[in-house]
């Protein structure tokens, strides 16, 4: 039997059943007297059900999450919703304002996605993470954290899970095209890891980045992510309509490929994202300024590319490619 609808409070936002309320999770006050708070939107359904929590911009140079949250907020009708959707468009507000990966106000815990859930009495970013984590764990049943390639790369549809059946189910509910489902490379320090440690479910999803921020491409990426938010609601029978699913679904591990030389990074003709490759297939080459090949990047195993650097100029040791080493299918 469906549970009765209830009033939901997240930070300063208190939403009665059937309403949408904006608010914030308070953190502290900055030196100039400006309050530091994390914005939230609570969409509380007219009927009872679970709480789905969506996080964006834990990295400030990844604006795709905020756009997806905007679209979802416009399109989800609380009168038709069973349960609650909590949208956190921007987790790391100072980083987002500076369009940087981490918090420019914090030297020691710069990257929130490595120190989460932080400490209530810790460095500034740790305090932000702790305030967010307290609110999330108190309310959420399952969560997605939206990422992208940020300022340095483009990442296509890829998901990290903790390999529990519940996390793989949530990943599958992202919908068609989201078949690259990898084991988490970061078992601690992220919202999804904290959700698991709290007996709940979270996943990390990747789509977008520097090569897809032209107006048309950025809008497309935001639309794709919003579609997945709605598809998840349908999968868990929180919203009307039938969910759709990816096929095939792959199981794999991430490997980062780094530059062996400095120069121009030139992907191989026809190389594509989320397309199966054989170990040794050409991914890219690095040339000097005269066009001489200095190094080649090849597939380290059978698998697929899900991320490539956006800047052609490259220095030895810089990141070039994210590769999913496919271990088989999940079907």
Model-derived regions, located:
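Structured catalytic-domain cores with a bias toward divalent-metal coordination
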Residues: 1-331
């Amino acid at each position: 039997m469906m549970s009765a609808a209830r009033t939901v409070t997240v930070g300063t936002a208190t939403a009665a059943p059937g309403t949408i309320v904006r608010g914030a999770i308070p953190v502290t006050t900055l030196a100039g007297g400006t309050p530091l708070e994390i914005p939230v939107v609570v969409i509380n359904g007219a009927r009872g059900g679970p709480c789905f929590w969506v996080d964006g911009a834990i990295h400030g140079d990844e604006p795709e999450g905020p756009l997806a949250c905007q679209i979802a907020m416009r399109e989800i009708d609380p009168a038709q919703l069973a349960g609650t959707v909590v949208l956190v468009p921007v987790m790391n507000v100072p980083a987002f304002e500076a369009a940087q990966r981490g918090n420019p106000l914090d030297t020691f815990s710069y990257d929130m996605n490595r120190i989460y859930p932080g400490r209530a009495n810790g460095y500034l970013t740790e305090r932000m993470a702790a305030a967010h984590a307290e609110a999330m764990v108190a309310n959420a049943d399952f969560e997605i954290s939206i990422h992208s390639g940020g300022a340095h790369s483009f990442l296509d549809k890829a998901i990290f899970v903790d390999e529990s059946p519940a996390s793989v189910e949530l990943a599958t509910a992202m919908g068609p095209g989201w078949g690259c489902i990898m084991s988490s490379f970061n078992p601690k320090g992220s919202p999804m890891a904290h959700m698991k440690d709290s007996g709940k479910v979270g996943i990390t999803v990747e789509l977008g980045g520097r090569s897809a921020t032209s107006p048309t491409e950025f809008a497309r990426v935001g639309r794709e992510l919003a579609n997945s938010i709605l598809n998840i609601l349908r999968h868990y029978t929180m919203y009307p309509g039938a969910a759709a699913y990816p096929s095939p679904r792959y199981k794999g591990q991430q490997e980062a490929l780094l530059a062996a030389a400095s120069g121009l990074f030139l992907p191989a003709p026809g190389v594509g994202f989320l397309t199966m490759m054989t170990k040794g297939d050409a991914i890219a080459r690095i040339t000097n300024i005269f066009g001489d090949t200095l190094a080649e990047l090849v597939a380290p195993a059978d698998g697929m590319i899900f991320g490539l650097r956006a800047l052609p100029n490259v220095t030895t040791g810089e990141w070039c490619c994210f590769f999913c080493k496919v271990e088989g299918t999940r079907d």
